[in-house]
C-alpha cells in the first residue's frame, strides 16, 4: 500500500499520497475494494480530516499506524516535548480518530503485541513488550485526551471520562461516549 511513495508524482505532490496508490493498484488489476483502502489508509491526515469510510480502509489505517508506532516504541523513539520528527503523535491521533467511531475495535494492547510479534518474526527484532506497551499507553492516553479536548469537552469532564483507564481500543469509544454524556448534562 506504499508503492505510490516511490513515484515521482507523490514526491512532487505529497497530497496525492494514497490517491496515486489507488490508481496504480487499479492499473495493476487489484480489487477496487483494496484500491480504495490504499487511498483511504492515509486518512485522517489531521484532526479536521475524516477517518476512512470503508471497513478495509479503517483496518489498514489503524494497522499501518500501529505498525509504525510499535516499531518506533520498540526502538525507544517517542515524541518528547515539542519534538516529534517522525509524526508519531499524528499517527496516534489518527488511530484514536478511527477507533472513536468503532464500537467493536480490537484492544489497542493486542494490536501492539501483534505488531511487535511481527517485527520479531519478519525482521528478527525482539522488542521488550512491557516497555513498548508502557510507552504507547502514555502516548495514547495523551492523544485520547487531546481528541476529547478537540471535541470541546471541558477539562474536568475529560478527566472524569478517562478515570477508568485507557487500555483497550473499545475504551476509546467508551471514553468519547462518557465525555459526551457528561457534557450533555
Model regions and ranges:
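Amphipathic alpha-helical "coupling" segments that flank catalytic cores
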Residues: 2-185
